[in-house]
Amino acid sequence: MHPECPERLQTVLDGLSDKPFRHLSRHEAPEIDLKLVEMVHQPYYVENIVESIPDQGRVHLDPDTVMSPRSLEATRRSSGAAVEAVDRVMAGDATNA
């Protein structure tokens, strides 16, 4: 079984709610425009990845990389989280990210 599964996510979320992390602010990650992703990855690479996303089930790009129908959303949100975190620090709304 691949390590990416709903139970793993729940374990991470449970761990982040433990005492050492309770003071951290949490924000919903926005879905970033893929044009911003193309600022750090070649457009052909982004296009190839997007085209590899299955309509159903899973696709293994390599032994460690599994894609499912919601992989694009996950990619856009994880990238969006990074951009949002930097924006908050640069705006002075956060001291670190």
Model-identified regions with their sequence ranges:
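HDAC/HDAC-like amidohydrolase catalytic core signature
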Residues: M1-A97
